[in-house]
């Protein structure tokens, strides 16, 4: 599972689409929101949304960063002309939010809503279930008043209908249940509305943050609608990261790549999101964090061709610049449940063969550790490859802990028993 943030605009559109249905008609949200971008101006938005010129407006950037009000990046109770000027003055400009600098490019526009009560609700996925947070004193100071937040826990395979919500009044209780069911059915991993208000059973989310499980895209894309997973604020993808991102979006498998240090000596080709964390953390724990070149994973039984393209991208990056100390490639993973190890290894082997000379020139040492369906065949292919390439390849099965193979790779080791 990869948790990925979505724009407030898209999250509010999802809420507007499903709140009435999931609350059995008790609540609704009209979803009056517009997204202004460099390609879609406020004038164009006003043509498609008549309310923009008929009501006071709220405007704020919609680029996956918070505390916009505290950074002076929220315009309230504005006329159309004021909103237009405010956006014009900020579009394409660099701002600093905390320690991060980035360019403003997307602005959320919605009706300004005068209100008396502000509520807070958040739902997040944890290892053993989902946790719900609620307070009837929401707003920008929620963190300073955290002792007033009520918490409820829904275990895995549990139902929110079985949870004791008697601490909430009946109206709020029904809303919490409806929102939680949307959260589960549409594969949210995090959803925070702070604040929201309720006016005559219309729920008005004034500020919303959401993340989705992107591996659910193929069965939820129709429910999600025309959403996107934006680049985190201030983050610019390299050409290679963009390529893997596009490849990931076209497949039912999961392919992720983040370049940490293109001149690093330690490179990872890891199967599985959980395993990728273990391998990367172990590299750092052993004192090689500054040498870690990349972070990422392939999982969900990718095809041989997809694995080849992924591996080729990593190997190409690794062999662009030589290091007199040589380089280390760890091809790892846990014990797969359904990914065909031999099939994915064939894709990696194809890429390694293609870069045979560059691997030698860069003095690359390769360490392999894998288990799962057809892993013995996959490991056999890897052993044979080492002889063919003239590149040292140490091959290990699931009998060797993941952390141990990293230690061997970074501090030297052989697999003479195999």
Language-model-derived ranges and their functions:
Residues 362-370:
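Short internal beta-strands
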Residues 2-192, 197-327, 353-357, 371, ...:
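ATP-dependent carboxylate/acyl-activation modules
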Residues 323-337:
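Short, glycine-/small-residue-enriched flexible loop/hinge segments at domain edges that mediate gating
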Residues 344-350:
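Charged helix-capping and loop-helix junction motifs
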Residues 338-343:
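Glycine/threonine-rich flexible loop motifs
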